Amino acid sequence: MTTVPPHSVQVHTTTHRYEAGVVPPARFEAPRYEAGIKAPSSIYHSERGPTTSQVLAVVAGLPVGGILLLLAGLTLAGTLTGLVVATPLFIIFSPVLIPATVAIGLAVAGFLTSGVFGLTALSSFSWILNYIRETQPASENLAAAAKHHLAEAAEYVGQKTKEVGQKTKEVGQDIQSKAQDTREAAARDARDAREAAARDARDAKVEARDVKRTTVTATTATA
């Protein structure tokens, strides 16, 4: 009776190849997320509150958009009011073409300005929404960078304020010196005028005395 040798298994560490009809064990694979399902980390980030960059974007964009919308509305209202007021004038003063042309140009400029302000405001709101939707979580030093920029802006404003104050002081000194020069010139002119008047008075007295003397002499000679 012959014995059948057992099946032998050869394992190669480099290729992981199995021979002699032995079925390799099943490998464990990490579960995949498909069909647009995000990983738990992204879910965690989506459940977090608004980041500093989003807050700064909203704070910076909302006032700009609101102001531009307000300017657009005011410009449109002013343009319409101007047209309502100017239309009867166009009908009455139709031969005057230059004012009509200027008014039409101003009206067109008003409409264009209103449209530009409105489009800019809408673009600002759209940018805010896109930025909030697509922005990534802010880094740790974002607050420090914002504080640094605010400090630089405050320093710049303080320096400009100091320069404006210095220029205002210099202009005030110049105005004061010019006023003093003007007062001195006026006083000098008044003094010269008084001296000229006194001199004219003396000359008039001398001339009157000479005339009187001449008259007396002529009367004496006639007598």
From Swiss-Prot:
What name has this protein been given in UniProt? Answer: P24 oleosin isoform B
Membrane-spanning residues where? 55-75, 89-109, 110-130
Region annotation Disordered: residue ranges?
Answer: 167-223
**Residue span of region Hydrophobic:** 58-129
Compositional bias per record (Low complexity), positions renumbered to this chain: 214-223
Function per UniProt: May have a structural role to stabilize the lipid body during desiccation of the seed by preventing coalescence of the oil. Probably interacts with both lipid and phospholipid moieties of lipid bodies. May also provide recognition signals for specific lipase anchorage in lipolysis during seedling growth.
Compartments it resides in = Lipid droplet; Membrane
